[in-house]
Curated annotation (Swiss-Prot):
Name recorded for this polypeptide: Fibronectin type-III domain-containing protein 3a
Signal peptide (residue range): none
Compartments (UniProt record): Golgi apparatus membrane
Matches recorded under PROSITE patterns: FN3
Taxonomic placement: Eukaryota, Metazoa, Chordata, Craniata, Vertebrata
UniProt keyword terms in alphabetical order: Golgi apparatus, Membrane, Repeat, Transmembrane, Transmembrane helix
Chief place where the protein resides: Golgi
Protein family (similarity comment): Belongs to the FNDC3 family.
Length: 1198
């Protein structure tokens, strides 16, 4: 069906012979839901109305039904048809199909309930019901089927039982082949699911929901909703099984997804809408259903028959914001409420079975122009007795410019008949020759090329008339302390459009000046300010217009309100302040605000900085007794008063301190920890009653039971105390009292505490006897044991007084210390221990061991050549040593003995470095050293191996292997691979202009190229070899001379044709080179010759060559020759030849031949230019290579 659901018309009441489909009842509280029942064309749908009668609705139609209690509505089916409820991928479908003979052989067909809530229940159908949400209906998939839009789609996990058996009615034959195929397909689905539904009763639908309903809509399932069902059959509760049922469900899901994709592709294949009948405010949009290619094998029953279309338009461009103007099944719609002369863009989107396709292409159209909108009513700008001036604004022209306005009036008759007053382009008009105090009604219309607009609202204006009448007396709106707000009304009988002004006059009786104006204006209200409080004022009002003033209104009296009173005086104390009470008094405020004071309120706050105020008194008296206070507390009090004008500010606060009393008794002190032998640690808490003052002191008293001698052992503010100087194992009594600024309170009850046995007393200092430099004997005496025998002694020994360690622990009275260092101070002390603990250590005793030979020399090492500053040091025959000074063990070190092999050891003085000379080059020595003092020689140090370096090498022979005018390549030594890996370095030097030799190269290479030299110049060089032994001697001086430079290469010569047998060759001119003249040599190669022949040699830079043969190739090249004048004779230096130039001689002919020569000449010029470019690139590359070589030579090698 592709139409909107029509209104439900009343139809004939069906007979009771039509079978009725009864549905199971659902228990629990069901949510209110909407069911959209679709009736196909040619079919009928029957419902029961509220009055109990039956109504038959013929298709095509859509019937919305509501269910408040979750029950399935009553649905009638025609004879010969039976309804079936099936579950298809999580969606319930109610299908009405013809009955088959084999379907009801004699029993009832049992249809299992799918795992979903049942169909919503039935409610009386109203005359008008809003359409359901778009996502709850979709097109019908076949004849006689109820599509899925009948059933709201939502998830659920509740369990339901089987449906009751349904009675079979109707005919036994099928109506047509299409119905038979539909029935067979649905029956197969029903039988396939019959075995799997029982196992899926407790599981949600396995199919993904394409269009889930939100819980806020009528057909959604709210959270926590009870959807349990009751069935007349047996209720089964099983978990979802595995195996065949699940695999079959997965296959169905995949099939459903493929069907959804195919449907979505079909819905997206829709053409853009067609726009017709475009008017100023309406347009007709039409479109076609999605196109589909139906083949011979295509199942036509799978093609959707009903689509839902959504039409969207936009007036902000194709990519602007679209709004939906239509949703339904029609193929056309008339869009209303459009704006004239506006561009619109429209597109359509198709939906089927809750699946939407892509929107169509955009169709653009423009609405027509039309008459203007009705203008606003004209307003008055000036008014006199005989004229009115009106003005108005232009309205929307709707696409056509407004060219005139029509102003009509009723001529003051008031009968509703209007005639033309003005017609033109102006936007204002002055109407003259009017009557005074007369009302005239006007209306306005605008006109453009499309027609006349509607008239504006009618407006009534009056001309000026007589003077204003007397207004009523002003009324009081509100009153304040210094202001009065008044209001008055317009005089009766005054036209509504007449401009009237008012004068408000006030009289202050105390001033004696009478009435004075306070306001002059058009407003009907005014607030008179700057008045005095509690004062009576008289007011009257006068109205006036352009014709004159009215008489004053009747005089009225109004009084300002009283002000809030001032703050009372600061309260003061009356009489003596007691520990728990005192009396206060206060004076009334100096300013009562213009009215009598009714009440005084006293507030109190505990503490000097408290912010919490409590009311303790409210009355008319001016004194109050504050009682039930705490001793020793600070209180702040303040007073404020209340009058007719309000509440005053609070007075300044009074600070009162109640006197304190002595504190109450404390609890007895208690023992903190375990009792010790000579001291007890006691702890206590403050008393429960502090007397109103902080506890400042505690007093602790002690006495023994035997002597009953009292003694105060502690007085202070702490809550704990350690009582010392006690005897071990004795009983002591203690009692406590607390004190504040008022004095001490009573003592607490006494407590008895017994001391524990104590550790031994402090031992006497031990005695130390040194037996040798590495051994000492320590002994001590037995101390006082304090009631327990000493079980062991602990001896601490160390080289520092504050860092000693226990070296002996045992019952003995002596100990021997071994492994000591000579001439070293040691510290020791001893401690006694018994069962009660360890006693205090004795005083520390210091002793010093006797002196001995020095310790082992450490850090013996060899020095490098750079670390030795002596000029007599030669690494080939000398070895330098250094070491650190060892411990002298109490006797100053007098020297060191160095042992370096079979030779006699060397004795040196008190030095820490020394070099041994007279050694053999390139020889290894084993060296060790020992320190000497007055007591003898110490032990030798560790042995090190040092080797003397070989002798420096001799300088090599220097040779020049290559040269040029600016470079010399020098070579020395053997340049083999073995020599390159040797440790020998070479230092090449050259003499500069000042006669000094400067370094050119230092490194292991055997060749070096000297660059940037001058031509024909002699240079002096020398070289020396270096190795790890040092630098060898310099070689003799070598002199090498650079030759003169040859001229540079010339550019390609230029050839100019003279005639058929003659041409002129021109080449580049070079300047003389350092005084030497330069001549030129020109060569030619004719035809297929392989060698160039000289045709000219001389100083000229051009040559005319004759004897050219026609159609023959000639190649010319030139070079420069430097003529050097040497002492030995004349010498020519020939430079490189230029690149050859090709020239072809041809006969002079008409313009065609000339063109050929031109082409050949152009080709020759191009060849010359290419050669020049190649030469420039080559020169730049050479310069760049030289620059890189210089940088490497300067920064890397040096």
């Amino acid at each position: 069906m592709a139409e909107h659901p029509p209104l439900l018309d009343t139809s004939s009441i069906i007979s009771s012979e039509i079978p009725l489909l009864t549905s199971p009842i659902v228990s629990g509280d069901g949510a209110q839901q909407v069911i959209l029942v679709q009736v196909n064309p040619g079919e009928a749908f029957t419902i029961r109305r509220e009055d109990g009668q039956f109504q038959c609705i013929t298709g095509p139609a859509q019937v919305p039904m509501m269910s408040p209690n979750g029950s399935v509505p009553t649905i009638y089916v025609p004879p010969g048809y039976a309804p079936q409820v099936i579950e298809d991928n999580g969606v319930r479908r109610v299908v009405v199909v013809p009955q088959a003979p084999e379907f009801h052989p004699g029993g009832h067909a049992v249809i299992h309930r799918p795992p979903h809530p049942p169909l919503p229940g039935f409610l009386p159908l109203p005359a008008m019901i809003p359409p359901p949400p778009r996502h709850i209906y979709s097109p019908v998939t076949g004849a006689g089927d109820m599509a899925t839009q009948y059933i709201p789609q939502y998830h659920t996990s509740q369990m339901y039982g089987d449906l009751d058996t349904l009675p079979a009615h109707g005919r036994a034959n099928f109506r047509d082949e299409r119905s038979s195929k539909t029935y067979e397909r649905l029956q197969k689905k029903l039988k396939d699911r019959h075995g799997t539904q029982k196992d899926k009763l407790n599981s949600p639908p396995s199919s993904p929901q394409k269009c889930p309903s939100p819980t806020s809509e009528p057909n959604g399932l709210t959270k926590g909703q009870d959807t349990a069902g009751i069935s007349t059959g047996s209720t089964k509760s099983k978990s979802v099984g595995k195996g065949k049922s699940n695999s079959q469900t997965d296959v169905e899901i995949e099939e459903k997804d493929e069907e959804t994709k195919a449907l979505e592709a079909l819905l997206s294949n829709i053409a853009k809408p067609v726009v017709s009948d475009v008017q100023a405010r309406t347009a007709l949009l039409m479109w076609s259903p999605p196109s589909i290619d139906v083949g011979e094998d295509t199942d036509k029953t799978n093609i959707p028959g009903v689509y839902t279309y959504e039409v969207m338009i936009s007036n902000t461009g194709k990519d602007g914001k679209y709004k939906t103007v239509y949703i339904g099944e029609e193929n056309k719609v008339t869009v209303n409420d459009l704006r004239p002369a506006t561009d619109y863009h429209a597109k359509v989107q198709v939906e089927c079975n809750c699946v939407k396709g892509s929107p169509s292409e955009v169709e653009s159209f423009t609405t027509m122009s039309c008459e203007p909108d009705a203008p606003n009513l004209p307003r008055i700008t000036n008014r006199t007795k005989n004229s009115l001036t009106l003005q108005w604004k232009a309205s929307c022209d709707n696409g056509s410019k407004i060219h005139s306005y029509l102003l009509e009036w009723d001529e003051g008759k008031g009968n509703g008949e209007f005639c033309q007053c003005y017609y033109g382009q102006q936007k204002q008009y002055r109407i003259t020759k009017l009557s005074p105090a007369m009302g005239y009604t006007f209306r306005l219309a605008a006109k453009n090329d499309m027609g006349m607009s509607g008239f504006s609202e009618e407006v009534l204006y009056h001309t000026s008339g007589t003077a204003a009448t007397t207004p009523a007396s002003p009324l009081l709106i509100n009153a304040g302390v210094t202001w009065l707000s008044l209001q008055w009304t317009k005089p009766s009988g005054t036209p509504s459009d007449e401009g009237i002004s008012y004068i408000l006059e006030m009289e202050d009786e105390n001033s004696g000046y009478g009435f004075k104006p306070k306001y002059d204006g058009d407003d009907l209200t005014y607030t008179v300010k700057n008045l005095r409080r509690s004062t009576k004022y008289k007011f009257r009002v006068i109205a006036y217009n352009s014709e004159g003033k009215s008489s004053p209104s009747e005089t009225v009296d109004y009084t300002t309100c009283p002000d809030k009173p001032g703050a009372p005086s600061k309260p003061s104390v009356k009489g003596k302040i007691h520990a728990q009470s005192f009396k206060i008094i206060w004076d009334p405020p100096k300013d009562n605000g213009g009215a009598a004071i009714n009440t005084y309120v006293v507030e109190i706050s505990e503490g000097s900085n408290g912010n919490k105020w409590d009311t303790i008194y409210s009355g008319a008296a001016r004194e109050h007794l504050c009682d039930r206070l705490n001793p020793g507390c600070s209180y702040r009090l303040r007073v404020y008063c209340i009058g007719e004008g309000g509440q005053s500010m609070a007075s300044d606060s009074l600070l009162v301190q109640t006197p304190a009393v002595v504190p109450g008794p404390c609890q007895p002190p208690r023992l903190q920890g375990r009792p010790r032998a000579r001291e007890i640690q006691l702890r206590w808490g403050p008393p429960q009653v502090d007397g109103g003052s902080p506890i400042t002191c505690y007093g602790l008293e002690m006495f023994q039971t035997e002597t009953d001698e009292h003694r105060e052992v502690y007085q202070g503010s702490d809550v704990e105390c350690t009582v010392g100087s006690l005897l071990p194992g004795r009983m002591y009594n203690f009692r406590l009292r607390a004190a504040n600024k008022a004095g001490f309170g009573p003592y607490s009850e006494k407590c008895e505490i017994t001391t524990a046995p104590g550790p031994p007393d402090q031992c006497k200092p031990p005695q130390v006897t040194c037996r040798s430099a590495a051994c000492a004997q320590v002994s001590w005496e037995v101390p006082v044991s304090n009631g327990a025998d000493v079980t062991e002694y602990r001896l601490e020994w160390g080289g520092m007084e504050g860092c000693m360690q226990i070296s002996y622990c045992g019952p003995g009275l002596n100990c021997e210390m071994k492994g000591l260092l000579p001439a070293t101070i040691y510290y020791c002390r001893v401690q006694a221990v018994n069962v009660a603990g360890a006693g205090p250590f004795s005083e520390v005793v210091a002793c010093m061991t006797p002196a001995s030979v020095p310790a082992v020399v450490t850090c013996l090492r060899g020095l490098s050549e750079d670390e030795v500053e002596s000029p007599h040091y030669y690494p080939s025959t000398c070895l330098a040593l250094s070491w650190e000074k060892p411990c002298d063990h109490g006797s100053e070190i007098t020297g060191y003995s160095i042992d370096f092999g079979d030779k006699q050891p060397i004795t040196v003085g008190k030095v820490l470095s020394y070099f041994i000379d007279g050694l053999q080059p390139d020889t290894t020595y084993r060296i060790r050293i020992q320190a000497l003092n007055s007591l003898g020689a110490g032990p030798f140090s560790h042995t090190i191996k040092l080797k003397t370096k070989p002798l420096p090498p001799d300088p090599p022979r220097l040779e020049c292997v290559a040269y040029s005018s600016q470079t010399l390549k020098l070579k020395w030594g053997e340049g083999t691979a073995k020599a390159l890996t040797d440790s020998i370095q070479y230092h090449l030097q050259m003499e500069d202009k000042n006669g000094r030799f400067v370094s050119l190269y230092r490194g292991p290479c055997h060749t070096y190229k000297v660059q940037r030299l001058s031509e024909s110049t002699s240079y002096k060089f020398c070289i020396q070899a270096c190795n790890e032994a040092g630098e060898g001697p310099l070689s003799q001086e070598y002199v090498f001379t650079t030759p003169k430079s040859v001229p540079a290469a010339l550019k390609a010569p230029r050839i100019e044709r003279i005639n058929d047998h003659t041409c002129e060759i021109t080449w580049e001119v070079l300047q003389p080179m350092k005084g030497d003249p330069v001549i030129y040599c020109l060569q030619v190669m004719v035809g297929k010759d392989s060698e160039f022949k000289q045709i000219y040699k001389g100083p000229d830079w051009s040559f005319r060559y004759t004897g050219l043969q026609l159609n023959c190739e000639y190649r010319f090249r030139a070079c420069a020759i430097r003529q050097c004048q040497e002492t030995s004779g004349h010498q020519d230096l020939i430079g490189p030849y230029s690149s050859p130039v090709l020239f072809i001689s041809q006969r002079t002919e008409p313009p065609t031949s000339t063109n050929k020569d031109t082409v050949q000449t152009t080709r020759t010029q191009w060849s010359q230019s290419d050669q020049v470019c190649a030469a420039v690139i080559l020169a730049l590359f050479a310069i760049f290579s030289i620059l890189i070589a210089v940088i490497i030579q300067y920064f890397v090698i040096k």
